[in-house]
Design a protein with these regions (language model features):
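Histidine- and acidic-residue-rich, metal-dependent catalytic cores
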Residues: 2-226
Length: 226
């Protein structure tokens, strides 16, 4: 298997520039805490349980750092806006994995990393994008990245919504097993307890606050995963 980044002075410089850009994705998406680094740690721990080869785990960690380069390249204001997306915005946003794949290639990442970036929104039931892959058509590393990305997003705050508790996030993940997520990957996530990156950043709930909502579970999940 090829190196994570093809080696030349020019390509090493491109790699460093794009890893810095990947770190800037957290700022662009306005997560309260380091998002991509957190995903990489969670994904790597799950990959370890599946006995992925060291090189495959390294590719997965790199893809986790770079997975939302497409969103940064698109520079869409709606990503930072409160509320649900319009149908047109949702269709536009679904372009970001392909754009991210192209950006990873420009950074001289190897093909494994490029494809993980492309496929990090594929769903177990085939309803994901951009290629509508399903079940084992999706590489295991991409299925792991999907779960790790979702859990990290649910348990971190953004300006327009709070973080979920660990318990609530796990409930959401369980409910979407065999729909969006590989059930086997979900089971491994649920077995992890001592990893610092699994900690939720949810703040204590004000007992006097109105916590009622008219959103059903799907709309709530969609809001958190924008």
């Amino acid at each position: 298997m090829s190196a994570i980044f093809r080696n030349s002075d020019k390509e090493r410089a491109a790699r460093e520039a794009y890893l810095q850009l990947a770190a800037a994705a957290d700022e662009f998406e306005q997560y309260a805490n380091p998002h991509a680094v957190r995903i990489a740690a969670i994904a790597d721990k799950i990959a370890e349980a599946f006995h992925l080869a060291p090189q495959d785990r390294k590719s997965l960690r790199t893809a986790a750092r770079m997975h939302d380069l497409g969103e940064v390249a698109m520079e869409r204001d709606y990503i930072q806006r409160a509320g649900s997306l319009t149908d047109e915005e949702r269709i536009d946003l679904e372009r970001h994995p392909v754009i991210g794949e192209q950006e990873a290639a420009r950074a001289s990442a190897n093909r494994d990393v490029q494809l993980l970036v492309r496929w990090h929104h594929e769903w177990w039931n085939g309803d994901g994008y951009p290629d509508a892959l399903r079940q084992n058509e999706i590489p295991l590393a991409a299925r792991i990245l999907r779960v790790a990305d979702s859990y990290a997003a649910l348990t971190d705050a953004r300006p327009y919504r709070p973080a979920m508790t660990e318990e609530d996030a796990r409930t959401q993940i369980i409910e979407r097993a065999a729909i969006e997520f590989d059930p086997a990957v979900v089971n491994v996530l649920l077995s992890l307890h001592d990893l610092e990156e699994l900690r939720s950043f949810a703040k204590p709930v004000d007992p006097l606050a109105d916590t009622t909502t008219t959103d059903d579970g799907w709309n709530l999940f969609s809001l958190f995963m924008k």
